[in-house]
From Swiss-Prot:
Gene3D superfamilies: 1.10.150.530, Aldolase class I. GO terms for molecular function: 4 iron, 4 sulfur cluster binding; metal ion binding; rRNA (adenine(2503)-C2-)-methyltransferase activity; rRNA binding; tRNA (adenine(37)-C2)-methyltransferase activity; tRNA binding. Disulfide bonds join C138-C383. Keywords: 4Fe-4S, Cytoplasm, Disulfide bond, Iron, Iron-sulfur, Metal-binding, Methyltransferase, rRNA processing, S-adenosyl-L-methionine, Transferase, tRNA processing. It comes from Brucella anthropi (strain ATCC 49188 / DSM 6882 / CCUG 24695 / JCM 21032 / LMG 3331 / NBRC 15819 / NCTC 12168 / Alc 37) (Ochrobactrum anthropi). This is Dual-specificity RNA methyltransferase RlmN. It catalyses: adenosine(2503) in 23S rRNA + 2 reduced [2Fe-2S]-[ferredoxin] + 2 S-adenosyl-L-methionine = 2-methyladenosine(2503) in 23S rRNA + 5'-deoxyadenosine + L-methionine + 2 oxidized [2Fe-2S]-[ferredoxin] + S-adenosyl-L-homocysteine; adenosine(37) in tRNA + 2 reduced [2Fe-2S]-[ferredoxin] + 2 S-adenosyl-L-methionine = 2-methyladenosine(37) in tRNA + 5'-deoxyadenosine + L-methionine + 2 oxidized [2Fe-2S]-[ferredoxin] + S-adenosyl-L-homocysteine. Its main location: cytoplasm. Its EC number is 2.1.1.192. [4Fe-4S] cluster binds at C145, C149, C152. S-adenosyl-L-methionine binds at G209, E210, S241, S263, L264, H265, N340.
Amino acid sequence: MSISFDLTIDDTRDQLARHARASLEAKPSLIGMSREEMAEALIKAGVPERQVKMRISQLWHWLYVRGVSDFADMRNISKDLRAMLAQHFTIARPEVVEEQISQDGTRKWLFRFPPRGAGRPVEIESVYIPEEGRGTLCVSSQVGCTLTCSFCHTGTQKLVRNLTSEEILAQLLTARDRLGDFPDKDTPDGAMVPAEGRKITNIVMMGMGEPLYNFEEVKKALLIASDGDGLSLSKRRITLSTSGVVPEIYRTGDEIGVMLAISLHAVRDELRDILVPINKKYPLEQLIKACREYPGLSNAKRITFEYVMLKDINDSLEDAKLLVKLLQGIPAKINLIPFNPWPGTNYQCSEWEQIEKFADYVNAAGYASPIRTPRGRDILAACGQLKSESERMRKSERLALEAMMIAGHGE
């Protein structure tokens, strides 16, 4: 049995009016700024230049180590400076519209971010997956997606916009809040989390969107997440998943240096063109070449290849043989993902016996090929199932909501 908490207020009109006021009063967030950007912003706000380096150090500690979301809690900063910071900036968390808890302990949050410019509030989903000794947060990089992968639920939602570095990091910060993963924060009773250490040990850019189509903001967010003075996550514990944006794979290795995962799903171009249409632009030969040249590959730093198991589509023994041949010489792990059904799909999950035969062949060839245990299926939180709640509404409901938003924004 799953549990769902609808955290929205009852009166939608009041909620939309609040968003309208927020858009008019919008202040830049310090969350997600690089040190250079923060220095420029602080000087512009009136912080003496000689103090800027010290103030940045203090702010990073409070934002990313202590996890505060109110300037008033920054106790080693003077009251006057806290007031000045609050006047010019925000460090508020996004609205948590809904929290769903699966029977297996997986948690899914629906976040709502305020309007940007003349836009509307947007919603995205993040998922927390607890396991023995680790807790993984699946983070979104876009509202919707442009890739239209035929087996993926997110691919049925049109791209609304890219998320900012602030909005990407806000998913991690808010999840840590709600799991009690910051000092002085309590873990919810009964929550499934690692028994010791951090509640969130790993992050994966595998939520809504294609991270490499939002490269600069994703890069900024991940460099802060891995900064020793920031959230201090090892780059070995951060995985970026891409459907194959080849030029940015090279940039990811050179400029970010996190672990790489490839949404592969097919070993023949003619099939991958259908399942993952970006393959028409960057076919398998180009994709695999970029993988072979990814910096620092070794048995300790392997590329993960994700392969969704689709009945009678890509699950034959011949597909397994071609997969092994395709990846020959690349330090790799192959995650076999039982297809997670969603409303309206025409695909079916492979038979379990066939998945095991496929895995056995790949294992025998020397590649680790774990079969991923489906997590959070009962709350549509499993791989390929994410989609903004507002996008699940009937068209008439969505148009009514948008009309109210327009009225609330005075457009």
